[in-house]
Protein backbone atom coordinates (compact mmCIF):
# COMPACT_ATOMS: atom_id res chain seq x y z
CA UNK A 1 0.00 0.00 0.00
CA UNK A 2 1.12 3.55 -0.66
CA UNK A 3 -0.51 6.87 0.21
CA UNK A 4 0.37 10.51 -0.11
CA UNK A 5 -0.11 10.94 3.64
CA UNK A 6 -0.36 8.44 6.48
CA UNK A 7 -1.61 9.86 9.78
CA UNK A 8 -0.83 7.81 12.87
CA UNK A 9 -3.46 8.49 15.53
CA UNK A 10 -7.11 9.53 15.26
CA UNK A 11 -7.19 11.99 18.13
CA UNK A 12 -8.13 15.60 17.37
CA UNK A 13 -4.69 16.56 16.01
CA UNK A 14 -4.46 13.57 13.68
CA UNK A 15 -8.04 13.74 12.50
CA UNK A 16 -7.88 17.44 11.65
CA UNK A 17 -4.56 16.92 9.86
CA UNK A 18 -6.12 14.10 7.83
CA UNK A 19 -9.21 16.21 7.14
CA UNK A 20 -7.13 19.15 5.86
CA UNK A 21 -4.85 16.98 3.71
CA UNK A 22 -7.73 14.99 2.22
CA UNK A 23 -9.71 18.15 1.55
CA UNK A 24 -6.72 19.42 -0.43
CA UNK A 25 -6.82 16.30 -2.62
CA UNK A 26 -4.27 14.00 -0.97
CA UNK A 27 -4.72 10.24 -0.64
CA UNK A 28 -4.81 9.84 3.15
CA UNK A 29 -4.82 6.85 5.50
CA UNK A 30 -5.44 7.16 9.25
CA UNK A 31 -4.06 4.39 11.46
CA UNK A 32 -5.73 4.18 14.89
CA UNK A 33 -4.76 1.64 17.54
CA UNK A 34 -8.09 1.74 19.42
CA UNK A 35 -11.23 -0.19 18.59
CA UNK A 36 -13.35 2.92 19.14
CA UNK A 37 -12.30 6.48 18.43
CA UNK A 38 -12.63 8.91 21.34
CA UNK A 39 -12.73 6.18 24.00
CA UNK A 40 -11.51 6.41 26.69
CA UNK A 41 -11.36 10.18 26.96
CA UNK A 42 -7.97 11.52 27.96
CA UNK A 43 -8.74 15.07 29.06
CA UNK A 44 -11.17 17.27 30.98
CA UNK A 45 -12.94 18.01 27.65
CA UNK A 46 -12.80 21.79 27.86
CA UNK A 47 -12.01 24.26 25.09
CA UNK A 48 -12.44 28.00 24.73
CA UNK A 49 -14.79 29.47 22.15
CA UNK A 50 -11.72 31.15 20.66
CA UNK A 51 -9.98 27.77 20.38
CA UNK A 52 -12.71 26.34 18.15
CA UNK A 53 -12.93 29.53 16.11
CA UNK A 54 -9.14 29.59 15.69
CA UNK A 55 -9.27 26.02 14.37
CA UNK A 56 -12.06 26.92 11.94
CA UNK A 57 -14.59 24.58 13.57
CA UNK A 58 -18.22 25.60 14.07
CA UNK A 59 -19.70 24.48 17.42
CA UNK A 60 -22.17 21.60 17.03
CA UNK A 61 -24.90 20.79 19.55
CA UNK A 62 -24.24 17.06 19.18
CA UNK A 63 -20.82 17.28 20.86
CA UNK A 64 -21.29 20.16 23.30
CA UNK A 65 -22.17 19.05 26.82
CA UNK A 66 -22.43 22.54 28.29
CA UNK A 67 -21.53 26.15 27.53
CA UNK A 68 -19.16 28.02 29.83
CA UNK A 69 -18.98 31.78 30.45
CA UNK A 70 -16.23 32.02 33.09
CA UNK A 71 -13.61 30.23 35.14
CA UNK A 72 -13.45 30.23 38.93
CA UNK A 73 -9.96 29.86 40.41
CA UNK A 74 -9.54 29.04 44.10
CA UNK A 75 -6.36 29.81 46.06
CA UNK A 76 -5.28 27.45 48.89
CA UNK A 77 -6.98 29.73 51.45
CA UNK A 78 -10.24 29.58 49.51
CA UNK A 79 -10.04 33.03 47.94
CA UNK A 80 -11.97 32.93 44.68
CA UNK A 81 -11.17 34.67 41.41
CA UNK A 82 -13.66 34.92 38.57
CA UNK A 83 -12.11 35.09 35.12
CA UNK A 84 -14.55 35.76 32.26
CA UNK A 85 -14.25 33.72 29.09
CA UNK A 86 -16.63 31.82 26.82
CA UNK A 87 -16.04 28.16 26.14
CA UNK A 88 -17.45 24.66 26.11
CA UNK A 89 -17.17 21.34 27.86
CA UNK A 90 -17.37 18.72 25.12
CA UNK A 91 -18.41 15.12 24.76
CA UNK A 92 -15.06 13.95 23.43
CA UNK A 93 -16.27 10.51 22.38
CA UNK A 94 -18.72 12.29 20.06
CA UNK A 95 -16.41 15.14 19.06
CA UNK A 96 -13.47 12.91 18.14
CA UNK A 97 -15.66 10.71 15.94
CA UNK A 98 -17.19 13.78 14.34
CA UNK A 99 -13.71 14.95 13.32
CA UNK A 100 -12.85 11.56 11.82
CA UNK A 101 -16.12 11.56 9.88
CA UNK A 102 -15.16 14.95 8.41
CA UNK A 103 -11.83 13.45 7.30
CA UNK A 104 -13.55 10.41 5.78
CA UNK A 105 -16.08 12.59 3.97
CA UNK A 106 -13.12 14.51 2.52
CA UNK A 107 -11.71 11.22 1.19
CA UNK A 108 -9.50 9.79 3.95
CA UNK A 109 -9.43 6.07 4.80
CA UNK A 110 -9.32 4.72 8.36
CA UNK A 111 -7.95 1.47 9.78
CA UNK A 112 -8.77 0.66 13.41
CA UNK A 113 -6.87 -1.72 15.71
CA UNK A 114 -3.70 -0.68 13.87
CA UNK A 115 -0.82 -0.48 16.36
CA UNK A 116 2.05 1.57 14.94
CA UNK A 117 5.40 -0.08 15.72
CA UNK A 118 7.92 2.19 14.07
CA UNK A 119 8.64 4.65 11.30
CA UNK A 120 10.08 3.13 8.14
CA UNK A 121 13.35 4.85 7.24
CA UNK A 122 15.36 5.05 4.04
CA UNK A 123 18.74 6.75 4.58
CA UNK A 124 17.25 8.82 7.40
CA UNK A 125 14.09 9.80 5.53
CA UNK A 126 10.71 8.62 6.82
CA UNK A 127 9.02 6.70 4.02
CA UNK A 128 6.18 4.92 5.81
CA UNK A 129 4.98 3.08 8.89
CA UNK A 130 5.21 -0.47 10.16
CA UNK A 131 2.10 -1.41 12.12
CA UNK A 132 0.41 -4.46 13.57
CA UNK A 133 -3.16 -5.00 12.43
CA UNK A 134 -5.74 -7.67 13.15
CA UNK A 135 -4.16 -10.03 10.63
CA UNK A 136 -0.47 -9.45 11.31
CA UNK A 137 2.33 -6.96 10.72
CA UNK A 138 2.11 -4.65 7.71
CA UNK A 139 4.09 -1.89 6.07
CA UNK A 140 2.42 1.11 4.48
CA UNK A 141 4.40 3.55 2.38
CA UNK A 142 3.76 7.28 2.45
CA UNK A 143 5.27 10.40 0.96
CA UNK A 144 4.60 12.08 4.31
CA UNK A 145 3.86 10.57 7.71
CA UNK A 146 2.06 12.73 10.26
CA UNK A 147 2.76 11.38 13.74
CA UNK A 148 -0.20 12.10 16.03
CA UNK A 149 0.36 9.04 18.21
CA UNK A 150 0.39 10.65 21.62
CA UNK A 151 2.75 11.46 24.43
CA UNK A 152 5.10 8.49 23.90
CA UNK A 153 5.00 8.67 20.04
CA UNK A 154 6.68 5.55 18.72
CA UNK A 155 6.80 7.14 15.29
CA UNK A 156 8.47 10.29 16.56
CA UNK A 157 10.96 8.29 18.62
CA UNK A 158 12.01 5.95 15.81
CA UNK A 159 12.34 8.97 13.52
CA UNK A 160 14.75 10.48 16.06
CA UNK A 161 12.62 13.54 16.85
CA UNK A 162 11.06 12.72 20.23
CA UNK A 163 13.25 12.29 23.35
CA UNK A 164 12.17 10.45 26.47
CA UNK A 165 10.23 12.46 29.04
CA UNK A 166 11.69 13.09 32.48
CA UNK A 167 9.26 12.94 35.44
CA UNK A 168 9.56 16.71 35.97
CA UNK A 169 8.48 17.25 32.35
CA UNK A 170 5.05 15.70 32.73
CA UNK A 171 2.01 15.66 34.96
CA UNK A 172 0.25 12.46 35.88
CA UNK A 173 -3.51 12.84 35.76
CA UNK A 174 -6.56 11.09 37.17
CA UNK A 175 -10.20 11.97 36.62
CA UNK A 176 -13.68 10.75 37.41
CA UNK A 177 -16.80 11.60 35.52
CA UNK A 178 -19.27 12.00 38.35
CA UNK A 179 -23.01 12.52 38.71
CA UNK A 180 -24.52 14.55 41.53
CA UNK A 181 -21.81 17.24 41.56
CA UNK A 182 -22.96 20.51 43.14
CA UNK A 183 -21.21 23.43 41.43
CA UNK A 184 -22.17 26.42 39.31
CA UNK A 185 -22.50 24.90 35.86
CA UNK A 186 -21.71 27.96 33.76
CA UNK A 187 -18.13 27.95 35.07
CA UNK A 188 -15.09 25.72 35.06
CA UNK A 189 -13.51 25.39 38.50
CA UNK A 190 -9.76 25.27 39.26
CA UNK A 191 -8.27 24.60 42.70
CA UNK A 192 -4.62 25.43 43.40
CA UNK A 193 -2.93 23.91 46.45
CA UNK A 194 0.79 23.07 46.60
CA UNK A 195 0.27 20.57 49.41
CA UNK A 196 -2.65 18.70 47.89
CA UNK A 197 -1.69 19.03 44.21
CA UNK A 198 2.10 19.59 43.95
CA UNK A 199 3.11 21.13 40.65
CA UNK A 200 -0.43 20.98 39.31
CA UNK A 201 -4.06 21.71 40.14
CA UNK A 202 -7.52 20.19 40.57
CA UNK A 203 -10.43 20.82 38.23
CA UNK A 204 -14.19 20.44 38.03
CA UNK A 205 -15.62 20.81 34.51
CA UNK A 206 -19.44 20.70 34.54
CA UNK A 207 -21.26 18.74 31.83
CA UNK A 208 -24.80 19.68 32.84
CA UNK A 209 -27.50 18.24 35.12
CA UNK A 210 -25.04 17.48 37.90
CA UNK A 211 -22.53 15.65 35.71
CA UNK A 212 -18.91 16.81 35.76
CA UNK A 213 -15.36 15.81 35.01
CA UNK A 214 -13.58 15.92 38.36
CA UNK A 215 -9.84 15.42 38.28
CA UNK A 216 -6.29 16.59 38.80
CA UNK A 217 -2.79 16.68 37.45
CA UNK A 218 0.32 16.53 39.63
CA UNK A 219 3.95 16.88 38.64
CA UNK A 220 5.56 13.53 37.86
CA UNK A 221 8.66 14.45 39.85
CA UNK A 222 6.49 14.95 42.94
CA UNK A 223 4.67 11.63 42.74
CA UNK A 224 4.96 7.89 42.22
CA UNK A 225 3.03 5.74 39.71
CA UNK A 226 -0.59 5.48 40.83
CA UNK A 227 -0.37 8.50 43.12
CA UNK A 228 -2.66 10.69 41.01
CA UNK A 229 -5.71 8.51 41.67
CA UNK A 230 -4.84 8.29 45.37
CA UNK A 231 -4.50 12.07 45.61
CA UNK A 232 -7.78 12.49 43.72
CA UNK A 233 -9.60 10.26 46.19
CA UNK A 234 -8.02 12.05 49.15
CA UNK A 235 -9.07 15.45 47.79
CA UNK A 236 -12.66 14.25 47.36
CA UNK A 237 -12.67 13.36 51.04
CA UNK A 238 -10.45 15.97 52.69
CA UNK A 239 -10.29 19.18 50.63
CA UNK A 240 -12.86 21.51 52.16
CA UNK A 241 -14.28 23.07 48.99
CA UNK A 242 -13.98 20.01 46.76
CA UNK A 243 -15.47 17.58 49.27
CA UNK A 244 -18.45 19.90 49.68
CA UNK A 245 -19.03 19.97 45.90
CA UNK A 246 -18.95 16.17 45.58
CA UNK A 247 -20.60 15.23 48.88
CA UNK A 248 -23.48 13.48 47.09
CA UNK A 249 -21.64 12.60 43.87
CA UNK A 250 -20.95 9.15 42.47
CA UNK A 251 -18.25 8.27 39.90
CA UNK A 252 -19.45 6.64 36.67
CA UNK A 253 -16.14 6.64 34.77
CA UNK A 254 -12.45 6.83 35.65
CA UNK A 255 -9.60 7.96 33.41
CA UNK A 256 -5.87 8.11 34.06
CA UNK A 257 -3.02 9.32 31.89
CA UNK A 258 -0.16 11.75 31.48
CA UNK A 259 0.31 15.22 30.03
CA UNK A 260 3.62 16.69 28.81
CA UNK A 261 4.32 20.09 30.39
CA UNK A 262 7.82 20.68 29.03
CA UNK A 263 6.90 22.64 25.92
CA UNK A 264 7.16 21.35 22.33
CA UNK A 265 10.00 19.16 21.09
CA UNK A 266 12.84 21.02 19.39
CA UNK A 267 11.93 19.89 15.87
CA UNK A 268 8.42 18.91 14.85
CA UNK A 269 9.43 18.08 11.29
CA UNK A 270 11.97 16.00 9.39
CA UNK A 271 12.43 14.46 5.99
CA UNK A 272 9.02 12.96 5.22
CA UNK A 273 7.52 13.51 8.68
CA UNK A 274 5.55 15.99 10.80
CA UNK A 275 4.68 15.73 14.50
CA UNK A 276 1.40 17.08 15.92
CA UNK A 277 -0.47 17.24 19.22
CA UNK A 278 0.89 15.37 22.22
CA UNK A 279 3.43 13.63 19.98
CA UNK A 280 4.96 17.08 19.40
CA UNK A 281 4.21 18.03 23.03
CA UNK A 282 2.15 20.96 21.81
CA UNK A 283 0.52 21.35 25.23
CA UNK A 284 0.33 24.58 27.23
CA UNK A 285 2.79 23.94 30.10
CA UNK A 286 0.90 26.24 32.47
CA UNK A 287 -2.63 24.91 32.04
CA UNK A 288 -1.92 21.44 30.65
CA UNK A 289 -4.48 22.17 27.94
CA UNK A 290 -3.75 20.83 24.48
CA UNK A 291 -7.03 20.59 22.57
CA UNK A 292 -6.92 24.10 21.10
CA UNK A 293 -3.29 23.76 20.01
CA UNK A 294 -3.83 20.24 18.67
CA UNK A 295 -6.68 21.36 16.44
CA UNK A 296 -4.85 24.36 15.03
CA UNK A 297 -1.49 22.61 14.64
CA UNK A 298 -3.23 19.60 13.10
CA UNK A 299 -4.83 21.78 10.46
CA UNK A 300 -1.51 23.48 9.71
CA UNK A 301 0.19 20.07 9.41
CA UNK A 302 -2.43 18.82 6.96
CA UNK A 303 -2.20 21.96 4.86
CA UNK A 304 1.61 21.91 4.76
CA UNK A 305 1.61 18.19 3.90
CA UNK A 306 -0.71 18.91 0.97
CA UNK A 307 1.53 21.76 -0.18
CA UNK A 308 4.54 19.44 -0.04
CA UNK A 309 2.76 16.79 -2.11
CA UNK A 310 1.69 19.41 -4.63
CA UNK A 311 5.25 20.75 -4.91
CA UNK A 312 6.75 17.23 -4.88
CA UNK A 313 9.08 18.26 -2.06
CA UNK A 314 8.80 16.38 1.23
CA UNK A 315 12.23 17.38 2.50
CA UNK A 316 12.80 18.72 5.99
CA UNK A 317 13.70 22.11 4.51
CA UNK A 318 10.25 22.34 2.91
CA UNK A 319 8.34 20.88 5.86
CA UNK A 320 9.99 23.37 8.22
CA UNK A 321 7.27 25.81 7.16
CA UNK A 322 4.93 23.76 9.38
CA UNK A 323 6.96 24.62 12.47
CA UNK A 324 7.36 28.22 11.33
CA UNK A 325 3.59 28.55 11.05
CA UNK A 326 2.62 26.94 14.35
CA UNK A 327 5.35 28.87 16.18
CA UNK A 328 3.90 32.06 14.75
CA UNK A 329 0.55 31.09 16.30
CA UNK A 330 1.72 29.68 19.65
CA UNK A 331 5.47 30.18 20.09
CA UNK A 332 5.27 33.12 22.50
CA UNK A 333 2.46 31.46 24.45
CA UNK A 334 4.46 28.25 24.95
CA UNK A 335 7.58 30.16 26.00
CA UNK A 336 5.75 32.26 28.58
CA UNK A 337 3.64 29.35 29.86
CA UNK A 338 6.73 27.20 30.43
CA UNK A 339 8.35 29.95 32.48
CA UNK A 340 5.17 30.62 34.48
CA UNK A 341 4.61 26.91 35.08
CA UNK A 342 8.07 26.51 36.59
CA UNK A 343 7.51 29.51 38.86
CA UNK A 344 4.10 28.44 40.14
CA UNK A 345 5.23 24.84 40.69
CA UNK A 346 7.91 26.10 43.10
CA UNK A 347 5.56 28.22 45.23
CA UNK A 348 4.34 27.14 48.66
CA UNK A 349 0.76 27.57 49.81
CA UNK A 350 1.83 30.57 51.87
CA UNK A 351 3.32 32.15 48.76
CA UNK A 352 0.32 31.23 46.59
CA UNK A 353 -1.99 32.84 49.14
CA UNK A 354 0.21 35.95 49.22
CA UNK A 355 0.03 36.11 45.43
CA UNK A 356 -3.76 35.80 45.61
CA UNK A 357 -3.88 38.71 48.06
CA UNK A 358 -1.75 40.86 45.73
CA UNK A 359 -3.83 40.33 42.60
CA UNK A 360 -7.32 41.04 41.32
CA UNK A 361 -9.19 39.12 38.63
CA UNK A 362 -7.85 41.30 35.81
CA UNK A 363 -4.31 40.50 36.95
CA UNK A 364 -5.08 36.78 37.02
CA UNK A 365 -6.49 36.98 33.50
CA UNK A 366 -3.33 38.76 32.31
CA UNK A 367 -1.12 36.10 33.90
CA UNK A 368 -3.10 33.25 32.34
CA UNK A 369 -2.95 34.90 28.91
CA UNK A 370 0.64 36.09 29.28
CA UNK A 371 -0.37 39.71 28.67
CA UNK A 372 1.14 42.76 30.44
CA UNK A 373 3.12 40.39 32.64
CA UNK A 374 5.73 43.00 33.61
CA UNK A 375 2.99 45.31 34.83
CA UNK A 376 1.48 42.53 36.96
CA UNK A 377 4.89 41.52 38.31
CA UNK A 378 5.64 45.09 39.42
CA UNK A 379 2.29 45.18 41.20
CA UNK A 380 3.14 41.94 43.01
CA UNK A 381 6.50 43.35 44.13
CA UNK A 382 4.91 46.53 45.47
CA UNK A 383 2.21 44.68 47.40
CA UNK A 384 4.07 41.53 48.45
CA UNK A 385 7.86 42.12 48.50
CA UNK A 386 8.33 38.56 49.77
CA UNK A 387 7.45 37.36 46.26
CA UNK A 388 10.23 39.40 44.63
CA UNK A 389 12.21 36.39 43.39
CA UNK A 390 9.18 34.98 41.54
CA UNK A 391 8.07 38.31 40.12
CA UNK A 392 11.57 39.00 38.79
CA UNK A 393 11.55 35.70 36.89
CA UNK A 394 8.24 36.64 35.27
CA UNK A 395 9.74 39.94 34.12
CA UNK A 396 12.67 38.32 32.27
Curated annotation (Swiss-Prot):
Function (record text): Is involved in the reduction of 2,3-digeranylgeranylglycerophospholipids (unsaturated archaeols) into 2,3-diphytanylglycerophospholipids (saturated archaeols) in the biosynthesis of archaeal membrane lipids. Catalyzes the formation of archaetidic acid (2,3-di-O-phytanyl-sn-glyceryl phosphate) from 2,3-di-O-geranylgeranylglyceryl phosphate (DGGGP) via the hydrogenation of each double bond of the isoprenoid chains.
Domain of life: Archaea
Known pathway: Membrane lipid metabolism; glycerophospholipid metabolism
Family: Belongs to the geranylgeranyl reductase family. DGGGPL reductase subfamily.
Cofactor binding notes: Binds 1 FAD per subunit.
Annotated Pfam families: FAD_oxidored (PF12831), GGR_cat (PF22578)
NCBIfam families the UniProt entry points to: GG-red-SF
Name this protein carries in UniProt: Digeranylgeranylglycerophospholipid reductase 2
Needed cofactors: FAD
Top class in the EC scheme: oxidoreductase
Species name: Methanopyrus kandleri (strain AV19 / DSM 6324 / JCM 9639 / NBRC 100938)
Annotated residues for binding of FAD: 13, 32, 43-44, 46, 92, 116, 278, 290-291
EC number of the protein: 1.3.-.-
One annotated GO biological process: glycerophospholipid biosynthetic process
Catalysed reaction, written as an equation: a 2,3-bis-O-phytanyl-sn-glycerol 1-phospholipid + 8 A = a 2,3-bis-O-(geranylgeranyl)-sn-glycerol 1-phospholipid + 8 AH2; 2,3-bis-O-(phytanyl)-sn-glycerol 1-phosphate + 8 A = 2,3-bis-O-(geranylgeranyl)-sn-glycerol 1-phosphate + 8 AH2; CDP-2,3-bis-O-(geranylgeranyl)-sn-glycerol + 8 AH2 = CDP-2,3-bis-O-(phytanyl)-sn-glycerol + 8 A; archaetidylserine + 8 AH2 = 2,3-bis-O-phytanyl-sn-glycero-3-phospho-L-serine + 8 A
GO cellular component: membrane
Further details from the record: Reduction reaction proceeds via syn addition of hydrogen for double bonds.
InterPro entries, sorted: DGGGPL_reductase, FAD/NAD-bd_sf, Geranylgeranyl_Rdtase_fam, Geranylgeranyl_reductase, GGR_cat
